[in-house]
From Swiss-Prot:
Annotated cofactor note: Binds 1 Mg(2+) ion per subunit.
Top-level enzyme category: ligase
Cofactors: Mg(2+)
Species assigned in the record: Rickettsia akari (strain Hartford)
Protein name: Succinate--CoA ligase [ADP-forming] subunit beta
Record keyword ATP-binding present: yes
This protein's GO CC annotations: cytosol; succinate-CoA ligase complex
A single GO molecular function term of this UniProt record: ATP binding
Positions bound to substrate: 264, 321-323
Length: 386
């Protein structure tokens, strides 16, 4: 789950991280009133969307008067902001964060993530802040600093000292950086975050460090422990189909292709998407119905897939372990009769009650294309949409 910048800063401040502060606007009629509350020489108007690259796309504006700030805020509110991380149509700006400007001496990059390849928490930092870290890693990898934290020992003083040293901080700034590392680590662990990113972390002209921008992504599996964080969820920023799927207990991610996929198990789902690409088409989605899906969940899964207007065909690939193939077959038929599947549908079943499932499908009277293995299924669905 993602949250907005202003929410991320609120959390970080609770853990002792110094951040820039501002005021939130969620209604156009509140813009002027909100800006009037700020007394500063420089105003920074920031679009609050769940995507990076806002600055380059015009979603962050720096102005030097209240009147300019009001005009910029009114112009920005409600637009569709297009960045390299949004869909082509962009993301609608329903919220603004208006801050006082800062005097910046130097910008740094600092983040903490769970490194799945190393199975541990890893700090990533760089003296090149305020830009895309992927670009820095590609062009000047030597400027990327990494420190991994052994899960058996947790954060140690040498991690904090090492990061401060590698970034070139000394004396009081090194002390400040050590405290920031400790605070960010505690926030990461205690909130079950997947990533905390501060970009840029700045040195002000007075020598103090400040988080000028912040992003936090949370592990959805840990949200049940944090109702206060779950309450920060902004459904307007999420794909409505993904929200609908989550409410139905389904794992769904829209991919932008033309073949809808319904699979049980994340590994099998990824293999299914790969083989669709291999045969010359593109998956429209990742959809894992889970191991204990019933008839109604299967029906809802197909409805969600068909809600995507880009879908030209559907591939159902089920291995019946915990799940029974006859239940899947009944769900497919119920969905087909209820909503009317007008695109080619290929079904590959294997495992528990597979013969019964195949019999149910063949006797349904519906135009369902059976497949005997994964390659056969991919070949048939790609051929069917051409």
């Amino acid at each position: 789950m993602n949250i907005h910048e202003y929410q991320a800063k609120e959390i970080l401040r609770k853990y002792g991280v110094p951040t820039s502060t501002g005021l939130v606007v969620t209604k156009t009629e509140k813009i002027n009133e909100t800006i009037d509350k700020l007394n500063t020489e420089v105003y920074v108007v920031k679009a609050q969307i769940h995507a990076g690259g806002r600055g380059k796309a015009g979603g962050v504006k720096v102005v030097k008067s209240k009147e300019e700030a009001k005009k910029v805020a009114h112009d920005m509110f409600g637009i569709n902001l297009v960045t390299h991380q949004t869909e082509p149509q962009g993301q609608k700006v329903n919220c603004l964060y208006i801050e006082s400007g800062c005097d910046i001496l130097k910008e740094y990059y600092f983040s903490i993530v769970f490194d799945r390849s190393a199975s541990c928490i890893t700090f990533i930092a760089s003296t090149e802040g305020g830009v895309d870290i992927e670009e820095v890693a590609a062009k000047t990898p030597a400027k990327i600093i990494k420190f991994s934290v052994d899960p058996a020992t947790g954060l140690q003083d040498f991690h904090m000292r090492g990061i401060a040293y590698e970034l070139g901080f000394k004396d009081n700034q090194a002390k400040q950086m050590k405290e920031i590392v400790k605070s960010v680590y505690n926030a990461f662990v205690e909130t079950d975050a997947a990533q905390i990113e501060i970009n840029p972390l700045i040195v002000q002209t007075d020598g103090n460090l400040l988080a000028l921008d912040a992003k936090i992504t949370f592990d959805d599996n840990g949200l049940f422990k944090h109702p206060n964080i779950t309450a920060m969820r902004d459904h307007d920023e999420e794909d409505p189909l993904e929200t609908r799927a989550a409410n139905a207990g389904l794992s769904y991610v829209k991919m932008g292709g033309n073949i809808g996929c319904m699979v049980n198990g994340a590994g099998l789902a990824m293999a299914t998407m790969d083989i669709i690409k291999l045969y010359g088409a593109s998956p429209a989605n990742f959809l894992d119905v889970g191991g204990g899906a019933d008839r109604e969940r299967v029906k809802e899964a197909l409805k969600i897939i068909l809600s995507d207007k880009e879908v030209q065909g559907i591939l159902v690939n089920i291995f019946g372990g915990i799940m029974r193939c006859d239940i899947i077959a009944e769900g497919i038929i119920a969905a087909a009769k209820d909503i009317g599947i007008k695109v080619p549908l290929v079904v590959r079943l294997a495992g528990t009650n597979v013969e019964k499932g195949e019999e149910i499908l063949s006797n349904s009277g519906l135009d369902i294309i059976p497949a005997h293995d994964l390659a056969d299924a991919a070949n048939k669905i790609v051929a069917a949409i051409r």
